[in-house]
Amino acid sequence: TLTYQVLEKHNHSGNMEHLQIKFDCMGVYDNTYVGILQTAYASGLKEFPMPCVFTNCHNCLCAVGGTINTDVHKYAESACVKSGGIFVPPHEAVIHQYMREMMINSGDMAIVSDSHTRYGTQGSVSIGEGGPELAKAMLGKYYEIDYPQVIAVYLTGAPKPWVGPMDVALSLIGAVFKNNFVKNKVLEFVGPGVKSLSMDFRNGIDTMTTESACLSSVWVTDENTREYFEVHGRPQGYQKMEPGSQALYDGIVEINLDTVVPMIALPFHPSNAYPLADVIADPEKYLGMVEEEAKRVFENNKDIHLDLKSKIINGKIKVDQA
């Protein structure tokens, strides 16, 4: 599998059942990097052992007047000067797109302090983790996990007009989250349907696989991938990535892109995914379901009352904001 190829290259344990991973690069952002840095410095950090990106895209400036937390950014900038990091100033980039465009090569592994860390469309197996694992990586320590199961996501067909990547992602999440079919496993996107998708479309699906409860995701690479690297000035980062002729998977999810329809996710999790047409046709049923679920979710907080049915006007859903 693609997953095996990438993990084997990064494993230092000598045992593919129990992995000790070293990453190619890492990324952190402004509402997590202070604690990560302080932990790493208190534990002996001198220089970052790999390229380490610091972005400022997660709204710590929004608290009061847009300036109250500028000291956070100064702290990170000084850490980059001190220890050799890459500081991306506020308002310049969102972390995941920066990593895709500037850092990730085919076959790489990255660790980033955000749950939606997914750079699989470039042939990378990347991990979103909490602060302690990022601090460990800053200190040159291994990321230790057992070898994960791998699920093939076999794509056929092509999306219809008005169907976007979120519709495909919600269809997948709705099918596999509640039954734990892909939990803590790696999703490997293969099949003839991949070539019908632009890189941005693939990225939109890829970043949402987190909500399926999988560990990571990776895609075969092709000419669209090669062009993506060329457009962003890094043609040398591209590598043809595909499974071997006898790749063995622990399971398979088949998605016929021809049949995917516009979807909507209702509270309180993206796996509550339904065809948008069904919700529009019977809003009483679906919004009533959400209200009943809210009673269970907020049973210990009697002050919270979810009123969605009042948004139904003449049989149609009134949207307050978007």
What are these regions (language model features)?
Residues 1-322:
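Fe-S-dependent hydro-lyases/dehydratases of central metabolism
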